[in-house]
Swiss-Prot record:
Mg(2+) binds at D168. The keyword Mitochondrion does not apply. Disruption phenotype: Leads to limited hyphal growth in plants and extremely low germination rate of pycnidiospores. The active site is at C206. Coiled coil: none annotated. InterPro entries: Isocitrate_lyase (IPR006254), Isocitrate_lyase_ph_CS (IPR018523), Pyrv/PenolPyrv_kinase-like_dom (IPR015813), Pyrv_kinase-like_dom_sf (IPR040442). This is Isocitrate lyase. Disulfide bonds: none annotated. It is found in: Glyoxysome. It comes from Leptosphaeria maculans (Blackleg fungus). It comes from the Eukaryota. Catalyzes the formation of succinate and glyoxylate from isocitrate, a key step of the glyoxylate cycle, which operates as an anaplerotic route for replenishing the tricarboxylic acid cycle. Required for growth on ethanol or acetate, but dispensable when fermentable carbon sources are available. Also acts on 2-methylisocitrate. Plays an important role in plant pathogenicity. Its cofactor is Mg(2+).
Amino acid sequence: MSHMDAEDAQFQKEVAEVKQWWNDSRWRYTKRTFTAEEIVSKRGNLKITYPSNSQSKKLWNIVEHRFKNKDVSYTYGCLDPVMVTQMAKYLDTVYVSGWQASSTASSTDEPGPDLADYPYTTVPNKVGHLFMAQLFHDRKQREERLTTPKADRAKVANVDYLRPIIADADTGHGGLTAIMKLTKLFIEKGAAGIHIEDQAPGTKKCGHMAGKVLVPISEHINRLVAIRAQADIMGTDLLAVARTDSEAATLITSTIDPRDHYYIQGCTNPALQPLSELMYAAEQSGKSGSELQAIEDAWVKEANLKLFHEAVVDTINAGVHVNKQELINQFLEQSKGKSNAEARTIAQGLTGVDVYFNWDAARTREGYYRYKGGCQCAINRAIAYAPFCDMIWMESKLPDYAQAKEFADGVHAVWPEQKLAYNLSPSFNWKAAMPRDEQETYIQRLAQLGYCWQFITLAGLHQSALMADTFSKAYSKQGMRAYGEIIQEPEAENKVDVLTHQKWSGANYVDNMLKMVSGGVSSTAAMGKGVTEDQFK
């Protein structure tokens, strides 16, 4: 067999393996727009097995089981190795937040708000930081257990430190190649899953900030396809979570996708010139700041911004038609799911009127179109994203059970097996939102709706801040009494392993490695005679 024949044979073998992999039940709801041949041709000759693939399989089994049983895996945003080891005792997944990374772990060391304006290595680096800690503490614990006689081994902790990590990919930090490189980084660093949102990259905001700009549905689907393609090239089961910010979005970059047309607003006042032209003229005349804002506010007020179907309904109601409601119902039924051009034709055919509606006139100074988000809008997007992702998350303004149910019911009406995720955000005022007994059951009530993975994005940040403030305040007044009462004594009472921080950090483990390579004796062992941690025995 010639070299080229062998090369082709190996290629066909790998293609067959990929096709068999894709036939696994793991992918029964996944749509791919590329072939196995295309994926294999993008791989190198050296096959690399990524540890994160084991974590991805583990994560899939968790959410698959939870969804099937109307149960839930819930977690929160982790800050550091200390936190990840403590979370592992009680929670079966770990979340890595872009918000937290932006404020505490940017790879430039420059903190800031959640605008995704940090280098895109930032969140993958945090994932790597935590994953390396997970691997280390797993090794440390295993060594302790295997060097403990069976009769005493039950007394040694047996924590599953290898909890799957789901991380924040923001908007992907650029175009499709940037998204693929970001996905590759996450896989290399140990992520089991990532989520990506449908905001525009240059204007990305925290999900609970104003001024969010969406990309068209088709553009976000391309992002999801890029993530899956990169994971396939690397041979991993990485979970892709599609987040939509459309519930509260007010702008969109383009009208290119007909699926977005229903939710784009236009000017219905034909007497007005386009806003962008008006603003440009005002700037040229020397106006700035509050003067420009006043001009825009006045224009918006006069423009009578509406969705196209609202403009048609108002036109019918203002006309002389005999059966107005029947005409309205006809239009709404016939125009459902149609592009704006098609809806215009239908409206003119039914009413005999060319309804004035100009979405270009309403564009902002930056060129964005006006958009009217909401739960139904988010459902529309989620239905489009579903075949290309593993879970879907709708960012929301409030912890509103009725809205969560509306979203879940809307998605499941089309995709009944679609797994959902939910942000139990600290941006919500939970005390004002619901009484304590409802807070206690909220996670499980959402689980009944199919929200099988839930998370508090910034609980790590807030618990760290609360503890730092509480202890610092007491320490400034009470000295070491504060440390004893607030930290050390509760650590001992609750059997927190970090009480003996030398052991927690792996000092015994490293001592045993030193002894292993030095013939069984080390005069410089860290945990030898004189170590102060003996005081806690």
